Design a protein with these regions (language model features):
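Residues in flexible loops and secondary-structure boundaries
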Residues: 34, 50, 65-68, 102, ...
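Solvent-exposed coil/turn segments that connect beta secondary-structure elements
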Residues: 29-31, 55, 63, 102-105, ...
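N-terminal segment of the mature soluble domain
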Residues: 33-99, 135, 166, 170-175
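Second-shell loop/turn segments in exported
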Residues: 28-36, 72-75, 109-110, 150-157
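C-terminal/domain-edge helix-coil "capping" segments
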Residues: 4-22, 88-91, 115-117, 125-195
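Acidic/histidine-rich, surface-exposed loop or edge segments in extracytoplasmic proteins
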Residues: 22-32, 67
Length: 195
């Protein structure tokens, strides 16, 4: 099923709520860029957002240990290591695994203009079936203008963190809230409940 209710294209299985997803392991970021700090920033931001959406925290160091044990490499260099979802589920006792790909993280400098582009893809897979439960992809382009290259570089670096935050907020807005969600929901108002 494809949906755009949250404003961004995403796919979600129709029976997501019935799947009973509570525990989500956040796999190390598949980083297609050369910046390891970007991958860390992205993963930390997603980790916090999942918690505030009502999914309990599974410490990243425990997840990283499992990737190190099973792949033989650290989580920062686990680019080619794709553990089966079932293996992660067995080791960690989770319901689903979220995979994240940092597709693009760059700034192009053209005279007095410097566009900064950040692109991310997220995919949530079920441990029980191995199928995709939810996925979304989002890009942000932030444009900067200035007369000196130094100031353009500074503006570009200052825009990365807000871009990551926007991407995470937008993509995860289409993921249903978890069972421990603390978000306030106003009561439904209907004409017949007023009387």
């Amino acid at each position: 099923m494809v949906g755009c209710a949250s404003g961004i294209p995403h796919t979600i299985v129709p029976d997501y709520k019935e799947q009973g997803i509570r525990l989500i392991a956040l796999a190390p970021v598949h980083n297609k860029t050369n910046d390891t700090q970007a991958a860390k920033l992205l993963r930390d931001t997603i980790f916090e957002k999942l918690y505030f959406k009502g999914y309990p925290r599974i410490p990243l160091n425990i997840i990283d240990e499992k990737f190190t044990e099973d792949c033989g490499v650290s989580s920062e260099t686990a680019q080619g290591c794709t553990l089966p979802v079932e293996t992660i589920g067995k080791h960690l006792g989770v319901d689903a695994v979220m995979y994240c790909t940092l597709i693009e993280w760059k700034t192009s400098f053209i005279s007095v203009y410097a566009p900064t582009t950040v692109s991310v893809a997220l995919e949530l897979k079920s441990v029980a079936t191995g199928g995709t439960l939810w996925s979304a992809e989002y890009s942000v382009v932030d444009r900067h203008y200035d007369f000196t290259r130094k100031r353009l570089e500074l503006k570009a670096w200052q825009s990365y963190e807000p871009a990551i935050q926007e991407i995470v907020d937008e993509t995860l807005s289409s993921l249903p809230d978890g069972p421990d969600s603390v978000e306030y929901r106003p009561p439904e108002k209907s004409f017949w409940k007023i009387w």
